[in-house]
Amino acid sequence: QAVLLDEYDEWFCGGTILNEYFILSAAHCINPSKDLRVLVGMVDKEKKEPSRAVHKVEKAIIHPEFNRTTYDSDIAVLKLEEPLAFSDHVVPACLPEEDFANDILMNQTFGIVSGFGNMFERGRPVERMKVLQIPYVDKDTCKLALRNPVTENMFCAGYDKDGKDACQGDGGGPHVTQYNGTYFVTGIISWGEGCGNRGKYGVYTNLSKFLPWV
């Protein structure tokens, strides 16, 4: 888990560590004209954690087909100036092969999302990182539930009643799927119509569609 910081040291989005130089995030999080830094190694905001480190972003690469209206192709890769030092709390996620992602991972019951975003809509950000297990949702069910278009580059996950969902401040963060004890990146937290609303689901960038680009 990584956190994106703006020029005022406020965090506003999440990210996924791919290796010591690259962070995966959402294109909607990136403002090309602003300085961007990445915080890694944080689990609890209130504690002094030796694993924490802040890194400057040398270059933010937004997918050329990102659509700011529909959030289609909502994916970006950040290159850091200096390499990360891995530790217990700074760990890269695995990138799956495309077929394995589509045939096996996306057919698991649950994925896992994490972040430091709001506890609920218009609520406050959490102090300690939240990790939620949320079910994959059938594309047709999701399209019927949401007003905005769910494209081929997106998938849905969440509960229709439970209220567990990603929320503001979580965008760009990881959706991972566990298989045989290994965590693979399967998505990027992208958008939703509110958070945890009854009958609605969270929408994620489908990483398997972008593996060659990444």
Regions found by a protein language model. Name each.
Residues 1-20, 70-71:
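A conserved glycine-rich beta-strand in the N-terminal activation segment of trypsin-fold
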Residues 1-8, 96-101, 109-214:
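Extracellular trypsin-like serine protease catalytic domains
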Residues 5-7, 23-26, 30-68, 89-93, ...:
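Conserved H-D interstitial segment of serine endopeptidase catalytic domains
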Residues 13-14, 27, 171-174:
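Beta-propeller and closely related beta-sheet repeat lectin domains
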Residues 21-25, 74-80, 156:
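A generic structural motif
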Residues 33-35, 52-55, 73-75, 88, ...:
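Extracytoplasmic
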Residues 47-48, 86-89, 121-126:
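Cytochrome P450 core scaffold surrounding the K-helix E-X-X-R motif
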Residues 68-92, 105-115:
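Serine endopeptidase catalytic core focused on the charge-relay Asp
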